[in-house]
Every structure is written in structure tokens, then in C-alpha cells.
Amino acid sequence: MADGSSETKSSNQMWGGRFASGPDAIMEEINASIGFDKKLYAQDIRGSIAHATMLAHKGIISAEDKDKIVHGLETILSEIESGAFDFSRRLEDIHMNIEARLASLIGPAAGRLHTARSRNDQVALDFRLWVKEELQRTEKALTGLIGAFLDRAEEHAGTVMPGFTHLQTAQPVTFGHHCMAYVEMFGRDRSRVRHAIEHMDESPIGAAALAGTGFPIDRHMTAKALGFREPTRNSIDTVSDRDFALEFLSIASIAATHLSRLAEEIVIWSTPQFGFIRLSDAFSTGSSIMPQKKNPDAAELVRAKTGRINGSLIALLTVMKGLPLAYSKDMQEDKEQVFDAAESLELAIAAMTGMVRDMTVRADRMKAAAGSGYSTATDLADWLVREAGLPFRDAHHVTGRAVALAEQKGCDLADLSLADLQAINPAITDKVFDVLTVEASVASRTSFGGTAPAEVRKQIAWWRARN
């Protein structure tokens, strides 16, 4: 198998010139990052090809050496992707594993690749490229989740359900309106992703260790070759910066919080006590002892992964909070946090998209529950303001008395007699019963962004044009 570790010197071949002996085994273990940063192999090779091409263009290395380097790097890419590459912990990281293998393939020309470059700007480039690509994947995944909610919202724009505050029945809404609330939430997540891509669209390569380089490089050329808008403007900040990683983790934490809230509602709604939805077999599990069980494990695991993603954000914030400018080895701890959060977020979005698409909405159960808990009480208060001319606070008090009477009688507001209501306030007429149904309540909420089916369809159309 191809091996990036054929060098037998006691000290590392890339930086061992001033060392008389190699590192202790414990030092080698704590120092090595190849176990996780090998995930950056494609970005590292892509960056090195762009760098070598620029060096040749500027006459810093020969065209012949550039061609050898590019061919060797392409060979290494094939070896890694086919599983034929042996990663060596002794070589610390992905950069030196690739460079060592390149040297074994093409000889001395490999040593010219690192001209005008440091691992400090190299890793900043690799990691930034990876995060940028992950953000693009996240944007696509969120678009799919938004699309799933738009489909359900369109299907249920007029399906009445109870709206809750404090998890207590509040006012009737439509399931379509509730779905559109999640569209707004995940739409904001997607906007944050897009803004983050703009923020990080600058190429670090060429900043070198921290001071730039005396070689006549063209950083604009490499930036363009790597798909960046422009190069970074300050070499010290370039190698100091992990804002792009922190911003990714912040976005991931907020999105995961939204996913967790959705997961919580799915768990609640799927219980027999609520019965608002029926989960598909594809996103449920059973019990090893209770044959009747159908557990919402996917939703529960998404809810749990939120804590894991939040933990990654806090971990990296803590790593970065006390560092002086330029590179410190502490920053090696950035990647595992981002890689783990990215994997968790990607899986969580996919799981929730599947659950939303496949779940069965039980409109009959939703409608039956919508009228419980005196959910049209606000409609009575509003009617008293409009038709009887009461100030809202007085109408609120009158309605509260009506609710108390209904509780005493064990009935709904709509089941009180006109005489009952007029005993509380004689201005009430029989027209009040027109507003005490859940359908009338929902239909009346025609304010911009409201739950009336016509308004929900406007919200859906607005988002369809942008998804």
C-alpha cells in the first residue's frame, strides 16, 4: 500500500533539522491530528495544486516541477479515495502525510511545493474550504426541509388545530399555519448559512506563517482558482481567524435548537393522548418487551443531538477565548468540534425531513381538540369590543366571567344559553354564536401573517417563490 511515512529519521522530516532526537511517544500521540484531519485531504490537495500552479506562473518554480507536483498530487488523491493510502501518525497531520507521499513519488521536486507557504495558512485554507462546502450542503438540506413543510402546509392550509401557549390551549389555528412557522424558522437558518458563506469567501493561502512572504506570489490568482471572491487582507488575522468555524457552529446550534423544538412537538403530537399525527414505520422503533409500542426515536435522538452540537460551539469558543494572535497549537482542537457538529446536523435535518414528509396528519383529532379549553374566548372578547363597544379590558373581564360559568356548568362557551350570557352582560345578542366556532375563529384571523387559510396560502406562495 502507498505509505506517506517511509522516512526513517528519528525526528520529523519536515521540521526536524534543529532537533537531535525524535519526540516521545506521548508527545507524538498528543501532537498528531491525522486521525481526524485526514477528512481534509481533498481540500489540501486542491489547495496545493492551486498554489503550485501560481508558483509556476510567477516563475518561482519551474513548469516541469509544477507538472510533477500536480501529477503526484492527483495520484495521491486517487490513492486516498481508493483506500490505498497509509496515513502515518508520526507525520502528524494531513499536510505532512501528503507531502511525504509526494516526495516518495516525485523526488526533490516535492520540496518546492511548500515555497511561500506555511502550515498555518495551509490549514486555514483547507479548513475554510471544507466549512464552505459543508455550509453549501447545509443550505441544500435546509431547502429540502423547507420544501417538506411547504407541501404539508399547502395540504393543510385549512385544517383546524389548537394553538398553544404554555402548552395550554390558547386559540384555534390551522396546521398549515403551524407548519409555516417552521418554514420561517428554517428559512432564517438558511439565510444565516448564506451570509456565512459570504463572510468567509476570502482565501487564506499566501499569508504564510503570519507575516506574509517575500516571494512575488499572486494571492488573487490562487483565490480565484479556489473559488474565493478575494484573498484575505491581513496576514496575521488570516492565521489567527477561526470565526468561520465559530459561525458555522453558531448556525448549527440555532438550527439544531429549531430542530429540537420540532422534535419535541412530534413526540408530543404522536402520543395517544394527543394523537395529532401518526408516525411512519420508517422513522419509528419498537420495544423489546412491549409489543404495542411505536416509539418516536428519530425525533428523540434529534432532540438529544442538539446538546451535542451546542457543546461543540462552547468547546471551540473556550479554545479560542485566550489565544494571542497568530497560530497556536490549541487551534488544532477546532476540527473535531466542527466535523462532529456537521455530521450531527446533517443527520438531524435528514431525519426530520423524512419524518415531516412521511407522517400522517390526523385532521379529525386536531379539529376535535381545537375547541377544547375555551379556545374561542378571545373571539368573544373581540366581539364585545366590535359589536357592544366595550373597551378591551372590560370585554376581557366579561369573557372571563363567561368562561368561569361554562366551567361551572361543564360545557363549552358555545353551549351557554343566550340568557346565561346576557346575565353577565345584557349587550350580548344571539349573533355572538357566529364567532364561537373554531372555523369562524380561524377564518377571522385575516391580519398579515395570520392563521386564516387565505393568509396561510399567501405565506406559502411567498416562500414557494424563494425556495
From Swiss-Prot:
Keyword terms, alphabetized: Amino-acid biosynthesis, Arginine biosynthesis, Cytoplasm, Lyase
Protein name: Argininosuccinate lyase
Example of a GO cellular component annotation carried by this entry: cytosol
Keyword check for Amino-acid biosynthesis: yes
Subcellular location: Cytoplasm
Family as reported in the entry's similarity comment: Belongs to the lyase 1 family. Argininosuccinate lyase subfamily.
Gene: argH
EC number of this enzyme: 4.3.2.1
